[in-house]
């Protein structure tokens, strides 16, 4: 119509405003470029592809805060959970921002978190060679990464949050240690409390000093629980791992690294994470996108028999006996008086000495959590028969077992010290062959 000019500008503005309100995720981004910054005041976040994870600032109020003031952190959480927010990573867990002025930006090929006075409180501190510009990305699996502009390998990063776990292990993360270079050890450390993300009392760490590797749950520096060694399928001391049908477990043990990792198979609607809780339990927590309520799939320590060295040397724990601690056949309580008073931590001693020769025999114990492996040696080339012969010839040998239970069993684990921290299961576990004096094998 002549004389009427359609106001397309206002129409488009209104249209995009409506879209932004109704579908805010359409405009979300997972990248941070060198000319951008995330600030507390802007309330902007990075959202991973698939809308599962979100990175941004969050605050907590703790009793330890001066005057109960808020503390601010840069972290990653599940965007898909309703109600209580579930955090999976915190950058500055032990160096909080003490007011609502904080900035995350890229500076000199590193991510830097600045406080109100532009003082760095956290940084990736990248020291290698980078092709500028670099970008930061929150990936679909929850990994926050820094990469340079010339990298064509999508799995190669200058820095990644997966190398610096907090209290949570996500699918595709690794827990363990690199054996080359000066890369950090990857462990889980609990929050100090449910509302304080600073480092707590409990940690979950892979022991890599011996021939076999197993995880320990520590309270400060004291061992609370041991998983048992990896047996080719699962950790020997966690029989329930065989029931984790939707989890693919893997253990890497080579010249470059020793680490555990897992992935969720088949059903991508399932979210699973391992969490070292502030109360001292390693938890496997799972939920689905359709039912966001979190379920505790598994938690340890589960019972008294899970506690580290609860029965002492040459004794095993069994939840189906009373008392729960039992001396191995051919052994007697080291201190009978304390044993009768249910103080069994001293363990047991041999009732008959070994002859160190063919006069000794072996007691087969089924469905066992294998003893602590710090005093064990490994020979991957031989089987159970050769392992027995080797143990017979070694007067220091106290027991042996298969290293790997796959395909009927292979490899040899041989203990040369006290057998400690054992338990018997109703199902699962492994066969353990304990060297005993011939007299101990005679039926009573």
From Swiss-Prot:
KW Nucleotide-binding (keyword) present: no
Keywords from the named record: Disulfide bond, Glycoprotein, Self-incompatibility, Signal
GO biological process, one term: rejection of self pollen
Tissues showing expression: Stigma.
Nucleus found in the keyword field: no
SUPFAM superfamilies: alpha-D-mannose-specific plant lectins (SSF51110)
Residues bearing attached sugar chains per UniProt: 43, 125, 243, 396
Disulfide bonds: 387-412, 395-397
Occurrences of domain PAN (ranges): 356-437
Gene3D superfamilies: Bulb-type lectin domain, Hepatocyte Growth Factor
The Bulb-type lectin domain, residue ranges: 31-159
Pfam families (UniProt xref): B_lectin, PAN_2, S_locus_glycop
CDD domains reported in the protein's UniProt record: B_lectin, PAN_AP_plant
Domain of life: Eukaryota
Residues of the signal peptide: 1-28
Job description of the protein: Involved in sporophytic self-incompatibility system (the inability of flowering plants to achieve self-fertilization).
PANTHER family attached to this UniProt entry: BULB-TYPE LECTIN DOMAIN-CONTAINING PROTEIN, S GLYCOPROTEIN
Protein name, as recorded: S-locus-specific glycoprotein
